[in-house]
């Protein structure tokens, strides 16, 4: 039986974490874990952040310093979307035209929330490390960084079927801003940072 490592600390991302973060991205997805999904999913939902905005990436690492969860953030949605179109979507297209088509549509418009919530985040934690308070600690670390950088708000999308996630974001203080597709959009205001 595999021993579960339950201790975890929050720290800044380092380059040696990249493969672990890609694995967490795949292991925590609701998509079927096919070979194609394992290839394009980290490109779509992980690589931009670790390659272009790593100062906005925090991990929870177990007692062996192996990443078991993360929060990723793009502090500027417009810059994120442009880079996705220029660099990452072409890579995804070579792997899966269907994924490319869906993501292209998702990334093609800047929503009306941009002015108030210019940043967005993704958070994933391996199941064995969930419900331990690590999600809140990851978001705390990110919020502190966003405030330092004078970012006024951050948003995220959570599946409407993810009851634990919905509860977590509400308890943390995120405000429900609306719905899009099968997701609930949450926002967190950091205040005016002049």
Regions found by a protein language model. Give the residues of each.
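Conserved GNAT acetyl-CoA-binding A-motif
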Residues: 117-119, 146-158
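Conserved beta-strand in the GNAT
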Residues: 59, 66-75
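Active-site rim helix/loop that mediates acceptor-substrate recognition in acyltransferases
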Residues: 36-57
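Conserved acetyl-CoA-binding loop-helix of GNAT-fold acetyltransferases
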Residues: 122, 131-145, 167, 171
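A short beta-loop-alpha structural element at the N-terminal edge
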Residues: 8-23, 75
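C-terminal "cap" of GNAT-fold acetyltransferases
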Residues: 152-163, 171-173, 177-194
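Residue-level recognition of the GNAT/N-acetyltransferase active site
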Residues: 122, 126, 159
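Conserved acyl-donor/pantetheine-binding loop and adjacent beta-alpha core of acyl/acetyltransferases
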Residues: 77-122
């Amino acid at each position: 039986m595999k021993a579960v490592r339950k201790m975890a600390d929050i720290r800044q991302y380092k380059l040696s974490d990249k493969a672990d973060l890609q694995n967490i991205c795949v292991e925590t997805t609701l998509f079927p874990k096919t070979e194609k999904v394992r290839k394009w999913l980290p490109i779509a939902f992980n690589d931009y952040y670790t390659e272009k905005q790593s100062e906005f990436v925090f991990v929870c690492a177990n007692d062996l310093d192996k990443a078991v969860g993360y929060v990723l953030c793009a502090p500027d949605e417009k810059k994120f979307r442009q880079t996705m179109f220029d660099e990452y979507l072409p890579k995804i297209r070579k792997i899966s035209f269907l994924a490319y088509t869906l993501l292209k549509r998702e990334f093609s418009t800047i929503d009306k929330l941009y002015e108030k919530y210019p940043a967005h985040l993704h958070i994933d934690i391996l199941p064995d490390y969930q419900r331990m308070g690590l999600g809140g600690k990851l978001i705390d670390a990110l919020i502190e960084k966003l405030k330092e950088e004078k970012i006024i708000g951050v948003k995220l999308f959570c599946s409407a079927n993810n009851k634990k996630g919905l509860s977590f974001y509400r308890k943390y203080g995120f405000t429900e801003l609306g719905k899009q597709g099968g997701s609930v959009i949450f926002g967190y205001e950091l205040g005016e940072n002049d």
